[in-house]
UniProtKB/Swiss-Prot annotation:
This is tRNA-splicing endonuclease. The keyword Lyase applies. InterPro entries: tRNA_endonuc-like_dom_sf, tRNA_intron_Endo_cat-like_sf, tRNA_intron_Endonuc_cat-like, tRNA_intron_Endonuc_N, tRNA_intron_Endonuc_N_sf, tRNA_splic, tRNA_splic_arch_short. Pfam families: tRNA_int_endo, tRNA_int_endo_N. Belongs to the tRNA-intron endonuclease family. Archaeal short subfamily. The active site is at 117, 125, 156. Keywords: Lyase, tRNA processing. Homotetramer; although the tetramer contains four active sites, only two participate in the cleavage. Therefore, it should be considered as a dimer of dimers. SUPFAM superfamilies: tRNA-intron endonuclease catalytic domain-like, tRNA-intron endonuclease N-terminal domain-like.
Length: 180
């Protein structure tokens, strides 16, 4: 399967490839279809985020080209670092959650880095919102409260994924609302 790098996205033009990639774990967004319940509903090109594309290349599931040149994992990762702020942190959390079996999608509409599903979009609502942080960064109590309000109003659990870039370890902290 082949994708083409277009700015900070990956375009899968072949419809059969688009279906196969989506079927592997709800990767990407088909053009013109908001939340397909199955890969068979896809009848258009698929757009992957650069993070998804880098992950799929690392797993050997996808080849990505730019101007006719095949891009390997290291090159794509470096492109991510130069084009996307916090790429190392975001990619670390994305990869870790995918390796744990979760379906990880953009959480931007919720003010989070990722919306995380146990089954998949279109089948369930995402139970978790994840914010990826460098363990050396600071976050204020007001920021945590703001994230918490959004997650609570959308009935999702808020999780901070805290990354140590030196050793690659990630700690997760979940916040829950209590009625007292």
């Amino acid at each position: 399967m082949i994708g083409e790098l277009v700015k900070d996205k990956i375009l899968i033009k072949n419809i059969e490839d688009a279906r196969l990639i989506y079927k592997m774990g709800y990767y990407g967004k088909p053009i013109g279809i908001s939340k397909p319940k199955s890969a068979e509903e896809i009848n258009s090109e698929l757009i992957l985020s650069l993070i998804e594309g880098v992950y799929l290349v690392k797993k050997g599931k996808l080849e990505i080209v730019s101007n006719g040149e095949r891009l390997d994992f290291e090159r794509l990762y470096q492109i991510g670092v130069t084009q996307i702020p916090r790429f190392r942190i975001l990619y670390s959390v994305y990869e870790d959650l995918r390796e744990k079996g979760y379906v990880v999608r953009s959480g931007i509409k919720y003010g989070a880095d990722f919306a995380v599903y146990t089954i998949g979009p279109g089948i369930e609502h995402a139970p978790y919102l994840v914010i990826a942080l460098d363990e050396n960064s600071q976050i204020s109590s007001n920021e945590i409260l703001g994230f918490g309000r959004v997650s609570h109003s959308t009935r999702k659990e808020l999780i901070l994924g805290i990354v140590n870039l030196t050793n690659g370890k990630i700690r997760y902290i979940m916040f829950k609302w209590l009625k007292m």
